[in-house]
């Protein structure tokens, strides 16, 4: 049975006694990878291939006699072949925890709507770290958008853990090879403390728990933290949280750390400020001690007893340890002072919560390009704030759909309360994405650009003089467009409305066309003028109506023609006047009717001619008077007929024919001359049957049966 201190090392795939440990150095601290450096000797294996050792699990055991005092497990990350004297081979080896693998992978990726446990779990699982435990008591809300950008998985994990106030350490089972990574946000979950007495005797055995040296120190550290941030959803929110440090009796309290942006969007920022404060002051008070016990390592709590300075006899939290073992006799023929073990450790008062100091977040060097995404078949995909989602060129994980990124705000040319400019980037368009404060978690779209598949309007360079704003019909091929062409001598402003165009002017509108103005309307036009309309035409106006024209004037209409007016109606013209109608001609008026003219007067018609009045009828004239007809001639009245002139009244007739005959026929004929009745003829026949019948008036062959009423037309 062995009674002394000894160290052994086993490597998977090799015999348990393949190596003898000459010395080792185990360095551990909270939120860091432990590093175990070993010097080894082997008499069995004078030559080893790297594939037999590297990436294999190795197990260091510290013994006191046959009792295990400590076990450490890790993977071999470095192996060196040393001297070979043909009897034995010296080797050097470095062992690290499985978490060490995370430092070998660098990545660009996006985590969406995941909390810190889910994010870190993904990183650990992908790196083969299966034995780990999250011990969280603080709230850790999900993050809408969290980006790992060019960081190793290890750097990203450490940064995220520090930001969330989480520290980690390796929990070693003392009597077995069980070992796991513990992520913790409170000291309450640390193992129960155990007592270690003060004993300055450095010759105690390893199995004897004691501390031989213990030095307590304090230093000036930041005294307070102020964090501030902004969210567009609550622009008036102060977004500020203050956290004062504790236990600052020995220093001034003016050492403020101001952090912006604080990377929070709500009341959770108070926790961020507190976690930062704990991190900045994690080494404000530190005690450093020495012991031969291997049981003191980060993640454990101890209670110091028996120290001559009474205030040091209290509970402490171990934050770092440096365990060094020497076993020189493992090399045959080499003498030494025997097997030794020293543990230099650091502790802080157990009533303080140790947290890692905040780590710098990578900043983006400049804008990036991305492609707007959305659901399959959708052309425009946005939320109530006009935000869109994009697919970054470096993103290998998220598909190009409605989940490819967080909602990203879009910078517009102008943005006011209910006014400004708005143009939503469409699915498939390439956009330029910048980042607020260089923070990958806060993207913002600052512009758009064309590429080989999304070409510009027009055909460059031929249309290089054109400035164009052209939209595209939603799920269609049409477009609306405003185009300015600055080609010399061909300057043009072009407006195209795919369907409806509405223009609203609340006060005045002036249109000034220096040369020509042409309007073409495919269907109907309606113009409504509430008050007055004035048209001034300098020279000529031509108005052509293809079918019908209706003009309605509510009250009066005045038409003034300075010189001539010609009105031509192809078939029929009807004029209806409600009360009175007057035509005044200053000089000459001529009416020409090619076929028929009809005039109807409901009551009376008067005709006044200042001097002469002439009526010329080519064939026939018919007058029909319902009652009385009266003609009055101031001087002379002449009635002339070329063949037959007849005057009739009932049975009385007076007929004059062209041969000079005069026929007077009536029932009773009375001749009365107040002075004389004279008659002269060679022969006068009275009552002798000499009278001849009165001839009838000839009937014209071209007389129509009756004049039509033109109103029917």
Ranges and model annotations:
Residues 180-181, 190-193, 635-637, 643-713:
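Intrinsic-disorder/coil detector with helix-boundary
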Residues 96-98, 113-135, 257-271, 375-403, ...:
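Glycine-rich, acidic and aromatic/proline-enriched surface loops and short helix-turn segments
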Residues 175, 183-186, 365-665, 669-672:
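Structural signature for extended repeat/solenoid scaffolds and their inter-repeat hinge/linker regions
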Residues 309-370, 446-452, 456-467, 700-702:
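Acidic, low-complexity/disordered segments
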Residues 1-19, 209-211, 365-371:
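Polar/acidic, low-complexity leader/linker segments enriched in S/T/G and N/D
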Residues 85, 114-131, 138, 146-350:
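Extended, domain-scale alpha-helical bundle/helix-rich regions
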Residues 48-133, 137, 142-146, 158, ...:
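Surface-exposed cap/loop segments at beta↔alpha junctions
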Residues 37-48, 281-292, 414-420:
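Short alpha-helix capping/helix-loop boundary micro-motifs
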């Amino acid at each position: 049975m062995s009674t002394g201190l000894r160290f052994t090392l086993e490597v998977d795939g090799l015999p348990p006694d393949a190596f003898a440990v000459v010395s080792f150095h185990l360095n551990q601290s909270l939120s860091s990878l432990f590093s175990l450096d070993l010097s080894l000797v082997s008499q069995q294996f004078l030559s080893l291939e790297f594939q037999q050792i590297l990436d294999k699990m190795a197990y260091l055991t510290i013994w006191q006699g046959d009792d295990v005092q400590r076990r450490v497990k890790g993977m071999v990350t470095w192996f060196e072949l040393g001297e070979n004297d043909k009897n034995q081979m010296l080797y050097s080896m470095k062992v690290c925890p499985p978490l060490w693998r995370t430092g070998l992978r660098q990545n660009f990726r996006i985590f969406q709507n995941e909390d810190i446990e889910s994010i870190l779990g993904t990183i650990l699982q992908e790196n083969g770290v299966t034995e780990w435990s999250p011990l969280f008591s603080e709230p850790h809300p999900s993050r809408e958008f969290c980006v790992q950008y060019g960081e190793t998985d290890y750097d990203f994990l450490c940064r995220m853990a520090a930001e969330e106030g989480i520290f980690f350490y390796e929990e070693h089972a003392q009597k077995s090879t069980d070992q796991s990574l513990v992520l913790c946000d409170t000291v309450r979950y640390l193992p129960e403390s155990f007592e270690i007495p003060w004993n300055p005797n450095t010759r105690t055995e390893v199995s004897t728990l004691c501390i031989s040296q213990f030095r307590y120190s304090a230093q000036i550290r930041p005294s307070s933290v102020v964090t501030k941030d902004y969210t567009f959803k609550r622009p008036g929110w102060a977004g500020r949280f203050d956290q004062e440090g504790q236990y600052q009796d020995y220093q001034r309290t003016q050492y403020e750390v101001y952090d912006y942006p604080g990377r929070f969007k709500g009341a959770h920022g108070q926790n961020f400020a507190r976690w930062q404060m704990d991190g900045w002051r994690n080494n404000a008070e530190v005690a450093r001690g020495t012991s031969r016990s291997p049981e003191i390592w980060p993640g454990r709590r101890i209670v110091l007893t028996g120290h001559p300075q009474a205030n040091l006899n209290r509970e402490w939290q171990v934050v770092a340890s440096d365990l060094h073992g020497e076993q020189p006799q493992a090399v045959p023929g080499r003498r030494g002072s025997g097997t030794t073990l020293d543990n230099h450790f650091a502790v802080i008062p157990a009533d303080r919560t140790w947290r890692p100091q905040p780590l710098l977040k990578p900043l983006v060097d400049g804008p990036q390009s991305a492609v707007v995404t959305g659901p399959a078949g959708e052309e425009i995909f946005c939320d109530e704030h006009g935000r869109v989602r994009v697919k970054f060129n470096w993103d290998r994980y998220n598909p190009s759909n409605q989940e490819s990124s967080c909602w990203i705000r879009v910078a517009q040319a102008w943005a006011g309360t209910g006014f400004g400019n708005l143009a939503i980037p469409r699915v498939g368009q390439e956009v330029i994405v910048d980042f607020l404060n260089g923070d990958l978690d806060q993207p913002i779209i600052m512009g758009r650009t064309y590429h080989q598949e999304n070409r510009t309007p027009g055909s460059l360079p031929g249309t290089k003089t054109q400035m164009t704003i052209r939209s595209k019909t939603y799920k269609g091929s049409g477009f609306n467009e405003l185009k300015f062409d600055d080609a010399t001598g061909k300057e043009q402003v072009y407006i195209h409305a795919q369907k409806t165009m509405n223009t609203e002017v609340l006060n005045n509108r002036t249109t000034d066309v220096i040369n020509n103005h042409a309007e073409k309307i495919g269907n109907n036009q309606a113009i409504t003028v509430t008050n007055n309309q004035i048209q001034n035409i300098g020279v000529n106006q031509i108005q052509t109506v293809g079918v019908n024209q209706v003009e309605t004037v509510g009250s009066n209409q005045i038409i003034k023609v300075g010189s001539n007016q010609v009105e031509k109606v192809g078939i029929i013209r009807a004029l209806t006047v409600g009360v009175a109608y007057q035509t005044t001609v200053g000089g000459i008026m001529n009416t020409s009717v090619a076929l028929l003219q009809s005039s109807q007067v409901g009551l009376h018609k008067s005709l006044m001619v200042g001097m002469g009045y002439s009526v010329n009828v080519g064939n026939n004239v018919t007058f029909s008077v319902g009652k009385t007809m009266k003609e009055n001639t101031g001087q002379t009245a002449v009635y002339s007929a070329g063949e037959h002139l007849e005057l009739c009244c009932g049975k009385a007739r007076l007929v004059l024919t062209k041969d000079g005959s005069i026929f007077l026929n009536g029932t009773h004929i009375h001749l009365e001359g107040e002075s004389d009745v004279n008659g002269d003829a060679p022969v006068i026949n009275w009552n002798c049957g000499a009278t001849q019948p009165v001839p009838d008036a000839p009937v014209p062959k071209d007389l129509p049966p009756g004049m039509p009423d033109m109103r029917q037309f």
